Amino acid sequence: MLTLDLLRTKIRGDCIEPRYVDTGSNRHRKLAAALIEIFAAHGDCRRGELEEALSRHSGDRVDYRIQRGLAKLLFDDHCELGVVADLPPEELRQRVFAVAHRYHPVVREPDLFHAVDRSQVIAEAGESCGLSGEQVEEGLYADLAENHRLVSFQPPSPQQLLNRYNVALAQAMLYRCREIEVTIGPDHRARHRQLFSAVKFNRLIHTVTRERGGQGFRIVLDGPVSMFRHSQRYGVRMAVFLPSLLQCRRWQLAAAIPDKAMERGPSRRGRGETVAETVAETV
């Protein structure tokens, strides 16, 4: 999912809406394809190296927030990152620190008064566990996030990535909403059951009423701001609910979103029904 700093919105009167990308735009498709290629080219590389490559690609682009959002989705949904080391990094550090303690003080370059330098400590620690100094260096801090290696990457198509991005924008809007009102029209009962199951599974506080004619429903969901005062966990559950709504054929969604710029006025209303046109391939 996208964090709030990556959310792009537009304001029209008292309404605030996500700024969806045009999934048919060649510019956006080229950007998505370029990012996918960067990830694919950095197999077995450290996360820090991959992030540096992404930063170089971003440069002075005015759409850097879109790139960062797309990259986050690739990291979260399509990458497997893990610790790659010949021994657990914690054990390697214990061995290195034990050797360094015996020779304290250890210097970077030996001199007349200090004969043991860092490279000697690393080499001796490696000998104690059958590893070379280079292997010890590689694994010593392999558990830091920036040193996690890209173990596998399952690339989406540029179209799928852009579609997923639009869904993520809508989800990010729900992190800080006060209330969501969903109207669903006539549909297969199985889809309605799936939607209500998602509401219950995510433990969302809600009320349900039937629409006139008995073919549709109106669902009012309490948002994370209404009761929990920006509870991140509840906000995430609210966002996770959205893809289940997208399975329905006829629906509308509006959310009341408090805005710091409108503290003395009414809350803004976020409208989300248009997202269905651009995200069909993601669900």
Locate each region found by the language model.
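Nuclease-adjacent, charged terminal/linker segments that flank catalytic cores
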Residues: 1-278
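C-terminal structured domains
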Residues: 281-283
